[in-house]
Amino acid sequence: MNHLPMPTFGPLAGVRVVFSGIEIAGPFAGQMFAEWGAEVIWIENVAWADTIRVQPNYPQLSRRNLHALSLNIFKDEGREAFLKLMETTDIFIEASKGPAFARRGITDEVLWEHNPKLVIAHLSGFGQYGTEEYTNLPAYNTIAQAFSGYLIQNGDVDQPMPAFPYTADYFSGMTATTAALAALHKVRETGKGESIDIAMYEVMLRMGQYFMMDYFNGGEICPRMTKGKDPYYAGCGLYKCADGYIVMELVGITQINECFKDIGLAHILGTPEVPEGTQLIHRVECPYGPLVEEKLDAWLAAHTIADVQARFAELNIACAKVLTIPELEGNPQYVARESITQWQTMDGRTCKGPNIMPKFKNNPGKIWRGMPSHGMDTAAILKNIGYSEADIKELVGKGLAKVED
């Protein structure tokens, strides 16, 4: 396979990934591959560009490092070109409503006829099969959260709230990435392709597992948070200091002992309710739970964030200031690790945003390109798989492909 022009870098150099999907979930999987060195081709509708393009800034992050192909993959010669592309593809990711590709004639079996080693990842709200009531429904972040039991666990005691920004999309996209890589590893061992069925609600069901297990194995429903505090454990969650907010996790024998001395609760240490060796204080089951919260709230409110951080560092209590977005760039840890970076857009502007993560020591990721325009790489991609200038012109003339203006 001849690769498209791009630098060689990262742990996935030489892997070709193609994705078809809009907005966040499916494309996020493609974005991860692209930042780790894979050659990633982004398929867009010929007539209508990905709706993410209407956003002013986010697409410059979510579509960097990609090659843009505008092709009608379901019709006539456009379908033929797509299947030709699949012959040189390692991983194909599609995000749609249920088995939408199969309904339009592009089944796993059709794809494997053209490439028996292809890894196919189907990402949808409710999966590729199930009941007619759900399988073909559209789904976004909040739908997956609501249907999975994840949303009902978030929010405050007064009202459930979805977790933002777009948590289900990102978890599902990352699941597609990891599952596809696992499948690719096996394919290289066996030579046999794989198809992966990723239902967003099942991803969120698994991500919401912690408290659910108490219900599935005992019928206990965990309450939601109160003002950002852990529903089970005292000293864990969001707290207000004299000049802002911190989060903390009061976990550990020494940590509890020393913290209780600071906040005036040394007398309850070693009691039947807080016996020696206590590592966590249950806010409901422990009779002293409410008192711990009361004393801790008062102590924190009387101290600045800096003072609290310094003291908790001495006690080895995990805590962090709740940073505002403007505070991120100047934070010394962000600066030291270059967590925020800049890159050039295709029209020559400078864009700022999150850097590549995670950080590979020997084969680091790289930002080599901004978001391509609609159809920017169509001609180059089609030439790469054997199409002539005349062939491409014919596809464009029939409305089956779009090249950059």
Swiss-Prot record:
It catalyses: crotonobetainyl-CoA + (R)-carnitine = crotonobetaine + (R)-carnitinyl-CoA; 4-(trimethylamino)butanoyl-CoA + (R)-carnitine = (R)-carnitinyl-CoA + 4-(trimethylamino)butanoate. It is found in: Cytoplasm. InterPro entries: CoA-transferase_III, CoA-Trfase_CaiB, CoA-Trfase_fam_III, CoA-Trfase_III_dom3_sf, CoA-Trfase_III_dom_1_sf. The active site is at D169. GO terms for molecular function: L-carnitine CoA-transferase activity. The keyword Oxidoreductase does not apply. Pathway: Amine and polyamine metabolism; carnitine metabolism. Gene3D superfamilies: Crotonobetainyl-coa:carnitine coa-transferase, domain 1 (3.40.50.10540), formyl-coa transferase, domain 3 (3.30.1540.10). Its main location: cytoplasm. It comes from the Bacteria. Keywords: Cytoplasm, Transferase. Its EC number is 2.8.3.21. It is an enzyme of class 2 (transferase). CoA binds at K97, R104. GO terms for cellular component: cytoplasm. Pfam families: CoA_transf_3 (PF02515). The keyword Oxidoreductase does not apply. GO terms for biological process: carnitine metabolic process. NCBIfam families: PRK03525.1 (NF002914). Catalyzes the reversible transfer of the CoA moiety from gamma-butyrobetainyl-CoA to L-carnitine to generate L-carnitinyl-CoA and gamma-butyrobetaine. Is also able to catalyze the reversible transfer of the CoA moiety from gamma-butyrobetainyl-CoA or L-carnitinyl-CoA to crotonobetaine to generate crotonobetainyl-CoA. Belongs to the CoA-transferase III family. CaiB subfamily. PANTHER family: L-CARNITINE COA-TRANSFERASE, SUCCINYL-COA--D-CITRAMALATE COA-TRANSFERASE. Homodimer. This is L-carnitine CoA-transferase. It comes from Salmonella typhi.
